[in-house]
């Protein structure tokens, strides 16, 4: 990989040869009230001082409102000799900088190990599609993915799609650049105002590319880390969308091929999520199964449920740190609660053993409360927040009226996640939870997945 030269702008201090007067000296000696540069929009609108905490200031947190924090960007200059390679491609330096320093950080758990930031410049030099996709997402992110998508974001998205069609047929383009481009197009699309659109066609396109990669034994043998990066990106995306895909449509990859590929990855540390590749595959299979029995309760398979439950409970890894361990336990419990609740929903029209049902409800409550506590062990300033919204929805929906304190923590955390990554799906998930809590408190508890589907929503969370 070639190294690009980075240099920060020199701070220019102007000086004057004129002597200062006593009045000027006294004026300069008086303390000056510094003006906030990073105060959130809410505090500025109220003309009050903001403590500039990120992603949520204390005032917004106390009032229980969304905090629209200003991004922390540094001035930088980058020597980019590769720009001359693509004279027909317009590079918006501001949007590119915004991606490198801000937006790309929402895709990883550790900003110091981020292949989607400065290391991606190598691929941007080769892929106009990736550059336009990045500029489109950056333009939308600046405006909190507003329902009125900025014109520049739409223009850049259109250019990205046009370039991508050409690049897919050209073998010299790196697979991770293509898959990142498609993933960003899906992100931009699902952040639009259409709550039914989760970027399905982009998911299926990526699935076809991964299938082709897994069939290519020479590629698997020679491009280890690059292939693992691509596979991990797909695994996480597939897990988040597995229950959104209609069961009658195209399903996952060949189970043997994908299982073997994940087994080969082992505990390889993926920059998006760490060492939980195997858990993501299990959770994706849980999501697909839950959607299947939701649509066709008569096809409930107790053997398959037992296998999935055993896979979830026995999965293990060695997380890099305790906070990552808390995130993995939240993922595991999300999968177990999802599986138990879907099974109970499928059998709700049948006679059930009251003792068995009561025991399972107690277990679900235990997992829900335990999971919230796991997630709250992760500070609100951590990049791990970007991967919490899906388990928060699952476990939050199970909290009872007696768990008001935990409900408040879930509310605060979803608002903080929105302030961090600005994806509207986080606020829609909170809205969904408020409806579910209201129904539960009135004696009508409901499973969150059918409730969401009845609203004709397909929220891509995580």
Predicted features and spans:
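Intrinsically disordered, low-complexity regulatory regions with latent secondary structure
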Residues: 1-46, 56-107, 111-119, 126, ...
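Structural motif
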Residues: 124-129, 172-176, 221-230, 270, ...
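Hydrophobic/aromatic-rich effector regions of fungal transcription factors
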Residues: 99, 117-123, 132-146, 156-196, ...
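Acidic/serine-rich, low-complexity amphipathic helices located in mid- to C-terminal regulatory regions
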Residues: 103-104, 186-288, 451-462
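Short linker/helix segments within small regulatory modules
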Residues: 51-55
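Short sequence/structural elements of tandem HEAT/ARM alpha-solenoid repeats
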Residues: 151-155, 177, 197-202, 350, ...
């Amino acid at each position: 990989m070639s190294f690009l030269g980075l240099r920060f702008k020199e701070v220019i201090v102007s000086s004057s040869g004129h002597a200062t007067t006593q009045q000027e000296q006294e004026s300069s000696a008086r303390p000056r009230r510094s003006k906030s540069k990073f105060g959130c929009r809410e505090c500025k609108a109220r003309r009050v001082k903001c403590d500039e905490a990120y992603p949520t200031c204390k005032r917004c947190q106390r009032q229980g409102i969304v905090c629209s924090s200003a991004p922390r960007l540094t001035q930088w200059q980058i020597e980019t000799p590769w720009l001359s390679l693509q004279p027909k491609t317009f590079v918006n330096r501001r949007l590119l900088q915004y991606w490198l320093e801000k937006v790309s950080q929402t895709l990883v758990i550790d900003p110091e190990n981020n292949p989607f930031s400065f290391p991606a410049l190598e691929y941007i030099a080769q892929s106009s599609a990736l550059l336009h996709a990045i500029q489109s997402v950056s333009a939308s992110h600046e405006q909190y993915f507003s329902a009125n998508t900025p014109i520049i974001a739409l223009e850049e998205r259109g250019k990205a799609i046009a370039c991508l069609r050409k690049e897919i047929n050209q073998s010299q383009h790196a697979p991770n650049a293509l898959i990142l481009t498609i993933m960003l197009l899906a992100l931009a699309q699902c952040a639009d105002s259409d709550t039914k659109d989760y970027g399905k066609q982009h998911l299926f396109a990526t699935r076809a590319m991964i299938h082709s990669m897994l069939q290519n034994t020479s590629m698997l043998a020679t491009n280890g880390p690059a292939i693992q990066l691509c596979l991990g990106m797909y695994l996480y995306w597939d897990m988040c969308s597995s229950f959104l895909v209609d069961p009658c449509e195209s399903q996952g990859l060949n189970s043997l091929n994908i299982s073997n590929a994940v087994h080969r990855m082992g505990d390889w540390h993926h920059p998006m999520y760490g060492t939980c590749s195997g858990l993501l595959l299990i959770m994706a299979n849980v999501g697909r199964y839950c959607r299947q029995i939701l649509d066709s309760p008569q096809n409930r398979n107790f053997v398959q449920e037992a296998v999935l439950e055993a896979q979830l409970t026995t999965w293990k890894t060695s997380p890099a740190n305790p906070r990552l361990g808390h995130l993995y336990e939240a993922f595991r419990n999300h999968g177990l609660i999802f599986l138990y609740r879907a099974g109970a929903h499928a059998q709700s029209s049948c006679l059930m053993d009251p003792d068995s049902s009561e025991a399972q409800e107690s277990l679900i409550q235990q997992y829900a409360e335990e999971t919230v506590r796991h997630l709250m062990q992760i500070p609100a300033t951590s990049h791990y927040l970007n991967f919490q919204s899906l388990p928060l929805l699952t476990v939050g929906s199970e909290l009872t009226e007696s768990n008001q304190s935990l409900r408040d923590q879930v509310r605060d955390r979803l608002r903080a996640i929105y302030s961090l990554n600005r994806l509207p799906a986080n606020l829609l998930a909170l809205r969904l939870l408020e409806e579910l809590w209201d129904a539960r408190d009135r004696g009508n508890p409901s499973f969150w997945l059918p409730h969401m589907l009845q609203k004709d929503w397909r929220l891509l969370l995580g």
